[in-house]
Structures are given as structure tokens and as C-alpha cells.
Amino acid sequence: MKNLLRAINPLNRPQTERLDERQVRNNAGGFVYTVSDESRLTRFLVLGVDGGTFYASAQKHTVQATDFVRELVQRDAALALRVTLDVVRGQRAPKADPALLVLALIAKTAPNAADRKAAWDALPEVARTGTMLLHFLAFADALGGWGRLTRRGVANVYETADVDKLALWAVKYKARDGWSQADALRKAHPKTDDAARNAVLKFMVDGVLPKVDSPALRVIEGHLKATEAQTDAAAAALMQEYRLPLEAVPTHVRGAEVYRAAMQTNGLTWLLRNLGNLGRVGVLTPNDSATVQAVIERLTDPAALKRGRIHPLDALKARLVYAQGQGVRGKGTWLPVPRVVDALEEAFTLAFGNVQPANTRHLLALDVSGSMTCGDVAGVPGLTPNMAAAAMSLIALRTEPDALTMGFAEQFRPLGITPRDTLESAMQKAQSMSFGGTDCAQPILWAAQERLDVDTFVVYTDNETWAGQVHPTVALDQYAQKMGRAPKLIVVGLTATEFSIADPQRRDMLDVVGFDAAAPNVMTAFARGEV
């Protein structure tokens, strides 16, 4: 009798045993839930698959994710396109490549012709730059030939894009991934009666600019003059006169004056990626207070961040690279300016938008188990899930007036992270506490044991739980019964797998994607009971 009771009692079910028939085994051997198709695709679009995980190599992780996307496109291409466009329009993802791959799969392989056409119609919106278009073409070409729909879809981009935008592509994005603008034009054969547009397209193909009087062609005219520049000063003057991007200037004259001019002629994305180069050539230094102040004002301007489509991960990556004083590949060194490092931290927070507090009692639980120290989040070199969890938790910790941050693996212990911590100190604290296997029930069990009043549990994890004797969903029910309150559980997934400890059928549990720019406000609304 006792054995039978034990067998059916969920309180006696460890995480290595299935709690119900909806659970599946994760990569660590524990049983969890699978997220919905929409949630899994969103994870792929936001987090990508670069770097693998502790339990799955980069290659296996990539194959699993891309196989899922392929299968979803065959089964419900309309859903795949809707989710992709939602992420793109909301500026929720740090990289465009996952969205470009999904769009290429729909455009080339969707069973329904209407879905394929819809994907091609969306191409100008998703491939916003010349680089993105060439990346898309590399994906699309690998999936099939150049039929009528493909030729028409690519031609449409060149026929409808603003001429000044095309002219910028002609000098800034000449070739990527084995594809050039000339290659695309020779295959697509766009047609137009617009003389300025035809002039740009001809220049893309053969490098010759016809004599057409149009302001849109000035960037190409300036580029042609810059190719003849013999000095840094001459090239810098042309950049300012013609508003040239850095790529329009030959590499042998890219000295300090050219980089100083580039600060005025290039956007915020360029600035984030080139802070180290600005320091390397002597433009951004502690002694140049005017330049430092100008950089800080741009980095901390909320409107400029939104206008420049700066994702929080862009700012975090820039901070990680710039603060270490040398490039990711070891090329070039510089002296980081502390005020610029602080501005990048502020930019990280501002890039999430105006996050409102839920004003509920939050327990922020960071998974610091061994698996969280492996792999790179969203392809950012050196940004482990462990560090990403600490960075994400700081947003909630600085927003919510009543929040506590703890770390868990097989046990639960304080991390000492406070709202006053910098990104670096918070990530260091999380890294220094890394230990043991993963038991995602620990935060809830600890709160019940300590009789701590919690309205919202937020668990930052890779969902590879396996080491506990109680499933997290059961622990939440036990807590509610013991404390006489109905808490909510938010799971912030930091790897692009299909797993979650949150039961998708329960209204008191929510699974969100780590580093989704929309995540903090969605979490607030859920904690308030608004969704």
C-alpha cells in the first residue's frame, strides 16, 4: 500500500522522473515541459544558437534548432512568419541572422505559395541593410535555385528601396558571405525608369557612375573621390563634406582624423562597435573631455537608442569588449575611459525602454550551476548564461522596490547582488558562486522554509534542471498551501532550447526569453496580473 501511494504522489517524484505525460527529458536527464512553437521560435530569433550549451555541443544545438524551424515552416509557415515579423518590428532581437534564416526557409520551402509570396513581400522590412540582404541571399541560395518568385522578390528590394539608401549600400555593403550586390543584380534583373536608381544599380554592377544630377548620388561621388585621397586629413574632409561612412574610405588613410569624422557621419550602431578603435587611434582618451562627453551624450540618449534600433545586448557586448581594453580577437589595445564604461551600462538599461515596476515582492533566483558557465548567449563572446542571468536580474532589481537576489544550484545561497552593483560586479558575483547540479525548485523550497512572503518568483536558468527531489511546479503548490498565498512563477530562459520548468497550461506561470527587449515589461504586466 505504501509503495503504491508513493508511486502516485507527486510530492515523492524527483526531477529525474516524469511528473505527467506532458513532460519530456531535457539534455541533463531531468523532466521538464516543452515550450509552445511560438515561444521556441522566439527563443531562436532572440538568442540564436551560437556557442552551444553545457549539455549540447554548438553543432548539435544548431541542428536541433534549425530542424525545429524547418519542421515548423512545413507545418505552419504563417505562424512562423507572424512571429518573425513581430520580433523584427518590436526590435526585440540583437541579431538579424535568425530572422533572415526563417524568412528564407519560408520563402523557399513553405508548402503554400501564398506563404512563400508573403515572405518575399516582407523581405525589404526584414533585410533593412545591404549586409542583411546579402546574408539572406546566402541562406536562400543554399535552399534552392533562382526561380521567378526568387528573382522577383530580390528585384523588388532594389526597385522599392529609397535611392539614397541604395547609394549607401553601394559604398558600404559591397559584398558579404560570398555574395556581392553585383551578383544579386545580375540574377534578379530589376527594372526601373528612375535615372538616379539606374545610376546606382549600374555603379553596383560595374563600378561606373553615370552622370545623373541627383542629391542621392553624392555619397557615391564622395566615395570615388575618397579612393584617390592620399592623406588622413583629405579623407576626413571628404567624409564630412559627403557624409561618408567609414567603409567608403580606403583602409590606408583611416587614421585619427578619419575616425573623428566618422563619429559625425556614422550612426549609433557604428559607435558602439568602434569605441575600442576610437581609443586605439587616440580619438577617445581620458584627456579629451569634449570627445568623451559627446560620446556619453549619444550613448545615454533614449531617443537616439530607439531611433538607432539599439538592442540591450548590443550595449552589453560593447561594454564587455570596451572595458577589457582589447579586441575579442586580440587585435588592438586601448585605455578604457571609466565614464564611457558607465555610459554603456546606462545604455544597457535604457535600451530596454521605460520599464515600470510591478510593485510586488520579488525573489530573483539565478541559476549558478555548472551548466550555466558554458556556451555564449546570443553569440556574444565571453557572455555565459551565468553572466547573462546576473545582467538581466539587475534590471528587475533596480526596478522593483522589494526584491531579493539569490543563487541556486543544488542548494540556495545569497549572492550579495544589490541595485548599486555594476554589471561587472554583479556578473563577477554570479560567476564566483558557480557550483553543483541544477535544482530549479530550490528558490521556492527555500522561501517556504524561511516563510518568506513572495508574490513573484523569477528564475533565470537554462532549464536543465535534474538534481531535485521535487518538481518546481509541485514546490510552487506546496508554497501556496503553506503560506496561504498564490505566487506567480516567471522563468527567464537563457538558451535557445525547447525546455522550460514552467507548465504552459498554468496561468500562474510564464516563460519568457532572456534578452528579449520586450521581456521586462511583459514580466511586469504578468506580475501585476494584467496578462
From Swiss-Prot:
Which keywords does this Swiss-Prot/TrEMBL entry list? Answer: Cytoplasm, Metal-binding, Ribonucleoprotein, RNA-binding
| Covalent S-S links between cysteines | none
Q: Which residues bind a divalent metal cation?
A: 369, 371, 438
Gene source species: Deinococcus radiodurans (strain ATCC 13939 / DSM 20539 / JCM 16871 / CCUG 27074 / LMG 4051 / NBRC 15346 / NCIMB 9279 / VKM B-1422 / R1)
State its location(s). Answer: Cytoplasm
**Entry annotated with the keyword Ribonucleoprotein:** yes
| Gene responsible for this protein | rsr
Recorded GO MF terms: metal ion binding; RNA binding
Its domain comment says:
The horseshoe-shaped TROVE domain is built with 7 helical HEAT-like repeats, and is closed by the VWFA-like domain giving rise to a ring-shaped monomer. Single-stranded RNA is bound in the positively charged central cavity.
Q: What does this protein do?
A: Binds to several small RNAs that accumulate during recovery from UV irradiation. Contributes to the resistance of D.radiodurans to ultraviolet irradiation.
Pfam families reported for this sequence:
TROVE (PF05731), vWA_Ro60 (PF25045)
Q: This protein is called what? A: RNA-binding protein RO60
Superkingdom per UniProt: Bacteria
| GO CC annotation | cytoplasm; ribonucleoprotein complex
Chain positions covered by the region annotation VWFA-like domain: 352-531
Q: Does the keyword Metal-binding apply?
A: yes
Positions of the UniProt region annotated as RNA-binding:
128-274
Report the residue ranges that make up the TROVE domain in this protein: 24-360
Protein family membership: Belongs to the Ro 60 kDa family.
Query: What does the annotation say about its assembly with partners?
Result: Forms oligomers upon binding DrY RNA, The multimers are of an average size of 700 kDa and are composed of around 12 molecules of Rsr-DrY RNA.
